Amino acid sequence: MTNYTHVAGRVHADQASDDWWREAVIYQIYPKPWADSNGDGIGDLNGVRQNLEYLAELGVDAIWFSPFFVGPQTDGGYDVADYRDIDPMFGTLADAEALIREAHRVGLKIIIDVVPNHTSVAHRFFKAALSTPPGSPEWQRYHLVRGQGEHGELPPNDWVSIFSGPAWTQTHFAGQPTGYWYLHIFDAGQPDVNWNHPDIVDEFDHTLRFWFDRGVDGFRIDVAHGLVDRKSTRLNSSH
């Protein structure tokens, strides 16, 4: 799937203003179905790189990449396990760096999706949380709340996820239910992170710096409206 946005006239490659994106022609690419360079039936970064001049000739100013990070890929790549590496189905980090260099050579800018509202259950932070008992420091990186009922066997409240069904999934430790549930506004494989925790802030600060260092020109922040201070939110109450 691809789509593009023509905001206004074409932006010149030498435009130095930080506001370049306001008038840019931005073309979105989901890598998986876009261009396959090696015949395995899956679009990849090298496939995009081979078509950069074509995109420039169309009048595109910038490419907005939907996630190409390592992850289970159960939600189109928006379930990220490693924000600083490329999923092997799309190529390698070296492929990404080569694509960015070539894009700049032909006058294109690169924007990538960053997903800071949640991680994948395969992210090292979440795996660390589930490998420790309730109340551990690792738990504090996510929204883990005691359930209702004598043993916490019921969800903390009646919140419904955007993908339907409860916005809570019960956790287990040593094979037994803990009575604690984690919040996921989207799929159960996408636990919401706690932006009040310094480890989360550091993780995404490092991620943005990592990609800026590799030449990325900007970011599209997924679920930006979800990045709010939740200290005052009663996660164990109903709407």
Per-range role (PLM):
Residues 235-239:
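Short "domain-exit" segments at the C-terminal end of structured domains
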Residues 2-205, 209, 213, 225-234:
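Acidic/aromatic-lined carbohydrate-recognition and catalytic surfaces
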Residues 217:
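Receiver (REC) domain switch/active-site residues of two-component response regulators
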